[in-house]
Amino acid sequence: MDDDIQAVVIDNGSGMCKAGFAGDDAPRAVFPSIVGMPKHLGIMVGMNQKDAYIGDEAQAKRGVLTLRYPIEHGIVTNWDDMEKIWSHTFYNELRVAPEEHPVLLTEAPLNPKANRERMTQIMFETFNVPAMYVNIQAVLSLYASGRTTGCVLDSGDGVSHTVPIYEGYALPHAIVRLDLAGRDLTDYMMKILTERGYSFTTTAEREIVRDIKEKLTYVAMDFDEEMEKSTRSSALDKTYELPDGNVIVIGNERFRTPEVLFNPSMIGRECSGVHECAFQTIMKCDVDIRRDLYSNVVLSGGSTMFPGIGERMTKEVIKLAPTAMKVKIITPPERKYSVWIGGSILASLATFQHMWISKTEYDESGPSIVHRKCF
């Protein structure tokens, strides 16, 4: 690899795609992982209509489009759409020729083998990249926090995972996947705001609710106490101005929304809360490394951005952990993008340069090379 050619780092999430260049401290492009297809062909007279819109443009024109999310629960389910997103990333967002840059991609923990192969194949055959590599998202988040051992709780828009990592390697047998993340919280908030008499139903309105969620919600230290406080006074109420100028009042929805992460039964799910997932993950690991994991629980992803989540998580994990165990929850301020940042760090390390899968290796071995080189 030439030293002067920057690698491209792409973190494809269920909700947002983060892309940029290795060595940078933040992604240059962050856009929704959405592909929009026109509902009715030729409806906009005089508009030179495209056959597909990606990301923010799809979002802006969502009224006349059918929106699709090619990544569901962290796993790619529609490869044609995924290819469109990658193409948009290279040519429109980063404005680079993919055949000139090595590409580091991220994948969800427990990503099916066939998916990694498909990813590899598209990169080499469709985009002709000179080299590529695939890494697990949670591992990159841990690197970004300056650690090689820890338990990562990564919660994004489509899926959450707790992943134990020891000396840089994820321990797959102990990974816990939780199909509960930002999108479910937005849905729940839409529901409870509707119960309050505000109507949020369309995909456009869902984006408004997502914005309310990101700006005004927080995690209560003690849910019942907070509920009581909110019934007694309106001190917790906040106002939010809708795009049409109307102002709505948000009350206990502010902390009821993220509470779902700790108590999924609120939305009728029988799964464990995020604190129990972290505990289960640690308990599935060798007894000798548990102490290291308990003292290095790193939060990452957009759905860990709620104020108060670190304190609440500490309180809940201490309740589950053995007495006298030191529990430390780390909430890096840049955790919304820590997967991408970890990728940027990794791809710019001198020691990483021999790890890339080169085009030559791919041509010799085919897509299955990814299992031998990326683990």
UniProtKB/Swiss-Prot annotation:
Chemical reaction(s) catalysed: ATP + H2O = ADP + phosphate + H(+)
Record organism: Phytophthora infestans (Potato late blight agent)
GO molecular function: ATP binding; hydrolase activity
Main function: Actins are highly conserved proteins that are involved in various types of cell motility and are ubiquitously expressed in all eukaryotic cells.
Main location: cytoplasm
Phylogenetic placement of the source organism: Eukaryota, Sar, Stramenopiles, Oomycota, Peronosporales
Stored Pfam families: Actin
The protein's name: Actin-2
Enzyme Commission no: 3.6.4.-
SMART domains: ACTIN
GO CC terms, sorted: cytoplasm; cytoskeleton
Keyword match Flavoprotein: no
Family in the record: Belongs to the actin family.
Subcellular location as annotated: Cytoplasm, Cytoskeleton
Keyword terms: ATP-binding, Cytoplasm, Cytoskeleton, Hydrolase, Nucleotide-binding
Gene3D superfamilies: 3.30.420.40, Actin, Chain A, domain 4
InterPro entries associated with the record: Actin, Actin/actin-like_CS, Actin_CS, ATPase_NBD
